[in-house]
Amino acid sequence: MNLLIIGSGAREHTFAWKIFNSKQNVSLFISNSNPGTTKIAKSVSIDINNFSDVKRSIIKNSIQIVLIGPEIPLINGIYDFIKNDSDISYVNVIGPSKYGAQLEGSKEFAKKFMYRNNIPTASYRSYDISSIDDAILFLKNNEPPFVLKADGPAAGKGVIIVDNVNDAIHNLKEMLIDSRFGDSSNKVVIEEFLTGIEMSCFVLFDGINYKILPYAKDYKRIGEGDKGLNTGGMGSVSPVNFLDIDLKDKIEKQIVIPTINGLIKEKIDYVGFIFIGLINVDGFPKVIEYNVRMGDPEAQVVFPRIENDFMEI
């Protein structure tokens, strides 16, 4: 079979490496390859955000499976584009629909999904430019620290934690008035600050069944000692040393299963990775965020721990 990987980073290199080592007969193609992938996959030049360009490559290379690495094509609806085009609708897409991708594309959408499905998470409020005065009043009437999140995608940099009201108001204005993160901060979610240790849970979902992959812990902050602004990821480790059987059981029963049931109940087209950002609060897991694709750098430490043939999972 011919399989196209969309993306050109270390995550996609990890996908290619794992699939290359499959016992199944897979011809690998990868968009805009990096030096590490040229030895194991054929590079195809694609503008991954131009879906007509993706279509041409699918047809030209007789692609049967498309595995999407980064979030932006998913948020922009690449799944829907492929499935709604009669020329290429036969292609299996590993990734959710545009509607499902809002779990990552909109913090407010994700929070509402969690609330509807009784999934433990921090309390929150959301505001846009029309309600900025209410947001400022909310900050003044509550105790810091505050967590401010751009509603839309911001490459892992749209979360700001502030320790005082003045800084919170300053950052809020930068996001809503000055468009600090472009359209992604047209709306801002203000969350309860949770104290605990963060970790990541990865689930592979086929629309009905799921498998939990190895857990990981990533380090987002740019400075030494886990300080400074968030990045897309400075590094990652797996296994997670504080993850015991009791915590695993709680994560599956209280978070993974309700997430899966919610996707099915709400008829959300979703086949692919569910990346659940968690925080362990005194032995009780809560969801910080959903991502609708595999993590990077997490893929680099998770996939080497998978002993199974990935094409058989």
Where are these regions (language model features)?
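Short, charged, surface-exposed secondary-structure boundary motifs
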Residues: 38-41, 102-108, 223-225
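A general structural signal for well-ordered alpha-helical segments in protein cores
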Residues: 12, 51, 75, 79, ...
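Glycine-rich nucleotide phosphate-binding loop and flanking beta-alpha elements
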Residues: 12, 73-74, 154, 168, ...
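Internal nucleotide-binding/catalytic subdomain
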Residues: 159-303
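Conserved, structured core segments of small domains
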Residues: 296, 305-313
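ATP-binding N-terminal substructure of ATP-dependent carboxylate-amine bond-forming enzymes
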Residues: 1-96
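Active-site nucleotide/adenylate-binding loops and adjacent lid/helix of ATP-dependent enzymes
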Residues: 4-5, 90-91, 103-189, 208, ...
